[in-house]
């Protein structure tokens, strides 16, 4: 079998062979350290009884490692120029299918049903996500309720910090809540910028998201819950009252009544959003939802 793709020499050889030029608009940075790939598949707990969806295979470095350890791999690639390269670099593996398309526009459940020979096997999602589209992809996968046991992503370290953050830290925010509401989040390890070609400006990190059996808190209306959390972080230095009154002007004439009701459930409107944990945000949104419906 040919030398691993994830080395500086082999990557350069492949790119030269096909005259491939990186597209900055697609955030293309290819891994050139096979040790990192092994750590990613170990973190994702890939086995021969696992199906994997990969997003953004590039020239196939991570795909190759996944193919060695998984039952089947289906990879979404948006850049048509990479399709013939992937045909070449992954030709030794009969358990890989590459789907040309944008995962943000795809019906992922349909792809699972059509592309995997055994769609009933446990599914995991693994990706080296382009920085510019990280958040939209993760939120789409969550909101579409894709039946994945876990998701393991390599992404910009700053975003990984935000996803895995805890309350009362500068990284904690609406993105933290949007993901941790459904998933347990663990920052697995840091990936230095030096192991990519071309080298990005910042370090990356691998984050492992494991689906909770039930959402972290009980809410009456999930859409409204996320609306409240986003509003609470609209201006981080402002209090809950300032942010919520700006988002929901109907609260202003009833401030005293609102303060009294929220104090009764242990939430003080002079706090900042970053100090509330997810169960507290659930209590806040449930109360607000009922409060705003009252005449």
From Swiss-Prot:
EC number(s) on file: 2.1.1.182
The entry's keywords: Cytoplasm, Methyltransferase, RNA-binding, rRNA processing, S-adenosyl-L-methionine, Transferase
One example GO MF annotation: rRNA (adenine-N6,N6-)-dimethyltransferase activity
Cross-referenced InterPro entries: KsgA/Erm, rRNA_Ade_diMease-like_C, rRNA_Ade_Mease_Trfase_CS, rRNA_Ade_methylase_Trfase_N, rRNA_adenine_dimethylase, SAM-dependent_MTases_sf
Claim: Ion transport is one of the keywords in the record: no
UniProt-listed GO biological process terms: rRNA methylation
Reaction equations catalysed: adenosine(1518)/adenosine(1519) in 16S rRNA + 4 S-adenosyl-L-methionine = N(6)-dimethyladenosine(1518)/N(6)-dimethyladenosine(1519) in 16S rRNA + 4 S-adenosyl-L-homocysteine + 4 H(+)
One cellular component term from this protein's GO annotations in UniProt: cytosol
Localization per Swiss-Prot or TrEMBL: Cytoplasm
Gene3D superfamilies in the cross-refs: Ribosomal RNA adenine dimethylase-like, domain 2, Vaccinia Virus protein VP39
Residues annotated to bind S-adenosyl-L-methionine: 29, 31, 56, 77, 102, 128
Family: Belongs to the class I-like SAM-binding methyltransferase superfamily. rRNA adenine N(6)-methyltransferase family. RsmA subfamily.
Function: Specifically dimethylates two adjacent adenosines (A1518 and A1519) in the loop of a conserved hairpin near the 3'-end of 16S rRNA in the 30S particle. May play a critical role in biogenesis of 30S subunits.
Record-linked PANTHER family: DIMETHYLADENOSINE TRANSFERASE (PTHR11727), DIMETHYLADENOSINE TRANSFERASE-RELATED (PTHR11727:SF7)
The protein's name: Ribosomal RNA small subunit methyltransferase A
Organism: Listeria monocytogenes serovar 1/2a (strain ATCC BAA-679 / EGD-e)
This protein's encoding gene: rsmA
């Amino acid at each position: 079998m040919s030398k691993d793709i994830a080395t500086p020499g082999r990557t350069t050889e492949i790119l030269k062979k096909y005259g491939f030029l990186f597209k900055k608009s697609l955030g293309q940075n290819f891994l050139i350290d096979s040790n990192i790939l092994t750590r990613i598949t170990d973190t994702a707990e890939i086995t021969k009884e696992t199906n994997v969806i990969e997003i953004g295979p590039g020239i196939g470095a991570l795909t190759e490692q996944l193919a060695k350890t998984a039952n089947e791999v289906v990879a979404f690639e948006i850049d048509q120029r990479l399709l013939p390269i992937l045909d070449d670099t992954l030709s030794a593996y009969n358990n890989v299918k590459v789907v040309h398309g944008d995962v943000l526009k795809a019906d992922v459940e349909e792809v699972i049903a059509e592309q995997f020979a055994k769609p009933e096997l446990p599914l995991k999602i693994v990706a080296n996500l382009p920085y510019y589209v990280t958040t939209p992809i993760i939120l789409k996968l969550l909101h579409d309720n894709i039946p994945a046991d876990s998701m393991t992503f390599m992404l910009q370290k700053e975003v990984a910090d935000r996803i895995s953050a805890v309350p009362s830290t500068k990284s904690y925010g609406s993105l933290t809540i949007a993901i941790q509401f459904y998933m347990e989040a663990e920052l697995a390890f840091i990936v230095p910028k030096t192991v990519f070609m071309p080298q990005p400006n910042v370090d990356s990190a691998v984050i492992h998201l494991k689906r909770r059996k039930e959402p972290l808190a009980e809410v009456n209306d999930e859409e409204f819950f996320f609306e409240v959390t986003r509003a609470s972080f609209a201006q981080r230095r402002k209090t809950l009252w300032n942010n919520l009154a700006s988002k929901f002007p109907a609260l202003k004439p009833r401030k005293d009544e609102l303060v009294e009701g929220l104090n009764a459930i242990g939430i003080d409107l002079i706090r900042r959003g970053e100090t509330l944990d997810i169960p507290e945000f659930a209590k806040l949104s449930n109360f607000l939802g009922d409060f705003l419906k009252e005449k």
